[in-house]
Amino acid sequence: MLRIWGRINSTNVKKALWTARELNLDYEQIDVGGQFGGLKDPAYLARNPNGLIPLLEDGGTVLWESNTITRYLAAAYGKETLWIEDAAKRAQAEKWMDWASSSFYTNFSNVMKHLIRLPEAERNPALLEQSLQGLAQSMQIANEGLKEAPWFSGENFGIGDIPTGCYAYAWFEFPIERPSLPHLEDWYGRLKQRPAYQAAVMTPLT
């Protein structure tokens, strides 16, 4: 059985959990990180020297980096579903995976901290506003990316949709004003209909 290490409210862990659920894989989820600690334990660091989450164990295969885990699970278990055999089409999907990780992470982390996690007295309104503007710009790029195809993976849902899908849930749940992004909103509406997305991603923001 697969083992996925990481707290369920982590956006990066959600990628792994969502992928596993889309593929109907049996897995054990182990809480580490955040309030659970454990990331500096020698046994954990022996598996992931970065001391970060998620971590995947599949028999003798041990992987870290959330996008790598998503790719691995899709390639190993999703040949007829999430994985894209055509190299050029797969590269288009993977482009969006890597773009999401580099474009969203810093601004998203700041918003989570200064809108959700910190006590109000400790929040930095200027940094929050700057980060919200950055997220809005990234979401506009994502919106434009959906003008020519219904999914970031092309004509069908696939690996390219998973990273942005995890960030999009929080974006649409934040108590903020959002610009009109019709292509992104349509795509998000279809994501919300997927049972695996509901179970793995649509959890309370904490």
How would you name each of these model-derived features?
Residues 34-35, 160, 205:
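Conserved beta-strand edge residues that scaffold enzyme active sites
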Residues 100-193:
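GST-like fold's C-terminal all-alpha helical module
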Residues 117, 205-206:
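Carbohydrate-binding/catalytic loop surfaces
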Residues 193, 197-200:
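Charged phosphate-binding loop/patch that engages nucleotide di/tri-phosphates or the phosphate backbone
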